[in-house]
Amino acid sequence: MLRLFLSHLLGVWLLLSLRARKIPAQEEVLKACGREFVRLQIRICGSLSWGKSSQQHREPRQAPAALPEIVSSSITSGAEALNGMLEYIPDLPQELKATLSEREPSFRELQPSLKDSNLNLEEVEKSILGRQNEAEDQSLSQLGRSRLDAHSRIKRSDYIRYSDRCCNVGCTRKELADLC
């Protein structure tokens, strides 16, 4: 009889403790305005991202096997960049261009050839900057035509609506986590 009573008492105690744990802090209504709202938002979004990273078990890192491939590709891209720069130099001797196509010369090998050619650094800079400005203008016009700017406005308006609501009425942690 005593054993049955204790088991029922233990069951009631477990149910009550489970009920107390079941009320999450996310349902608590918080009022925050201005800086307090921003700090709360940062705290909530930061805790969400840290929680995700701490739940993942990370394996020990090993050295990448493709390291030589990465180094060789960076050397190749450096040579391509140098060849691209040399296209902008009009008075460059053909011997130097042929040397570049055969192998990648060091700067010391290039220096005498560059002294012989009458290079005007300002002309090179103007031509490079002119092409960069044209590329920037094209990318900005493409962005204006796309709907990316409209999406950012919508997201910003959602954020403003939540901040006003949290200041005047109050909001829950779950609602703030939706903005992350």
Curated annotation (Swiss-Prot):
Q: What molecular function terms (GO) are annotated for this protein?
A: hormone activity
Annotated S-S bridges: C33-C167, C45-C180, C166-C171
Cite the record's tissue specificity text.
Expressed by the placenta. Exclusively detected in cells located in the lamellar placental labyrinth and absent from other placental and non-placental uterine parts.
Q: Which SUPFAM superfamilies match?
A: Insulin-like
Q: Which domain of life is it from?
A: Eukaryota
Keyword terms of this UniProt record: Cleavage on pair of basic residues, Disulfide bond, Hormone, Secreted, Signal
Q: Which InterPro entries match?
A: Insulin-like, Insulin-like_sf, Insulin_CS, Relaxin, Repro_Hormone_Insulin-like
Pfam families assigned to the protein according to its UniProt record, in alphabetical order: Insulin
Range of residues in the leader sequence: 1-25
Annotated propeptide span(s): 53-154
User: Where found in the cell?
Assistant: Secreted
Chain ranges passing through the membrane: none
Cellular component, GO annotation: extracellular region
Keyword Membrane carried by entry = no
> What is the annotated role of this protein in its UniProt record?
Relaxin is an ovarian hormone that acts with estrogen to produce dilatation of the birth canal in many mammals.
What is annotated about its quaternary structure and interactions?
Heterodimer of a B chain and an A chain linked by two disulfide bonds.
Family statement drawn from the similarity comment of this UniProt entry:
Belongs to the insulin family.
The name this protein goes by in its record? Prorelaxin
Organism, as annotated? Felis catus (Cat)
Which gene holds the coding sequence for this protein? RLN
